[in-house]
Swiss-Prot record:
<dbReference type="GO" id="GO:0016853">
    <property type="term" value="F:isomerase activity"/>
</dbReference>
<dbReference type="InterPro" id="IPR053037">
    <property type="entry name" value="Pericyclase_pydY-like"/>
</dbReference>
<comment type="pathway">
    <text>Mycotoxin biosynthesis.</text>
</comment>
<keyword id="KW-0413">Isomerase</keyword>
<comment type="similarity">
    <text>Belongs to the pericyclase pydY family.</text>
</comment>
<comment type="function">
    <text>Pericyclase; part of the gene cluster that mediates the biosynthesis of pyrrocidines, fungal natural products containing a macrocyclic para-cyclophane connected to a decahydrofluorene ring system that show potent antibiotic activities toward Gram-negative bacteria. Within the pathway, pydY is involved in the late Diels-Alder cycloaddition step that leads to the formation of the decahydrofluorene core.</text>
</comment>
<protein>
    <recommendedName>
        <fullName>Pericyclase pydY</fullName>
        <ecNumber>5.-.-.-</ecNumber>
    </recommendedName>
</protein>
<keyword id="KW-0843">Virulence</keyword>
Length: 185
C-alpha cells in the first residue's frame, strides 16, 4: 500500500511491512556485517513489521527517532531510540557485535558525498531523509542507512537505501516497505 503524501519523518508514528517483490537481496550486506548464516536465512524468510516514530523533545528541542522491528510469531524484536544529533552511541547487538551509531537528518548533497546511491530516487527537501551511520567495531565495517520516501511505478513507498563498506568490498541495497497505517499513541 502506498505511503500517503502527508506522512513524513518530521512527526510520524506509522508502521510498514516489507515489500519483498521490490527489495534487493540483503545476503551480501548481512554477510559483510558478520551476521551468522542461520540468521541471514531467517532474515530472508521473515516479514518484519517496522514502526517509526519521530517527535520533538519539548525539553531539548531535538528531534527524537524511535525505530522498532517486530517479527511475527512472537519472535523477539528490536527497538532503538536516538536523537537526530549525530552524537555517537555505542551498544552491543546480538549477531552484529559492538556498534557505534550516529543518526541525523540527511540532505542529498551530504549523502552524495558519501555514495551517490544513498539519495538516488528519494524525495528531497527538509526533513525528508534520516541518515544512520553504523560503525561495526568488531569487524571494521561501516554501514550508511538512509530512511526516505521514493516513488516506484507511481506509488510512494518508505524506502531504505543502504551502503556497507568493509575494506575494499562494498554492498548496496534498497529495502522497500508497504504502508500499514498510523499507530496509536
Amino acid at each position: 500500500m502506498a505511503t500517503p503524501g502527508n506522512v513524513t519523518f518530521k512527526n510520524t508514528h506509522d508502521s510498514w511491512g516489507m515489500n519483498w517483490g521490490l527489495c534487493d537481496s540483503s545476503e551480501q550486506m548481512l554477510t559483510m556485517q558478520g551476521m551468522p548464516w542461520i540468521m541471514r536465512k531467517l532474515a530472508s524468510w521473515i516479514s518484519v513489521t517496522v514502526v517509526i516514530k519521530t517527535w520533538t523533545d519539548p525539553e531539548t528541542g531535538e528531534t527524537r527517532f524511535l525505530l522498532q522491528h517486530n517479527p511475527p510469531m512472537g519472535l523477539p524484536g528490536m527497538s532503538e531510540e536516538r536523537a537526530l544529533d549525530y552524537v555517537p552511541d555505542e551498544l552491543t547487538v546480538p549477531n552484529l557485535g559492538k556498534l557505534r551509531v550516529r543518526t541525523r537528518w540527511g540532505t542529498a548533497k551530504e549523502l552524495d558525498q558519501l555514495d551517490k546511491y544513498l539519495a538516488r530516487g528519494l524525495e528531497k527537501g527538509p526533513h525528508s531523509m534520516i541518515h544512520m551511520m553504523t560503525e561495526h567495531l568488531d569487524i571494521d565495517a561501516v554501514t550508511h542507512q538512509i530512511f526516505g520516501y521514493e516513488e516506484i511505478d507511481g506509488t510512494r513507498y518508505h524506502v531504505r537505501r543502504i551502503v556497507v563498506r568493509k575494506g575494499h568490498e562494498v554492498a548496496r541495497l534498497r529495502l522497500v516497505y508497504n504502508y500499514l497505517g498510523p499507530r496509536a499513541g
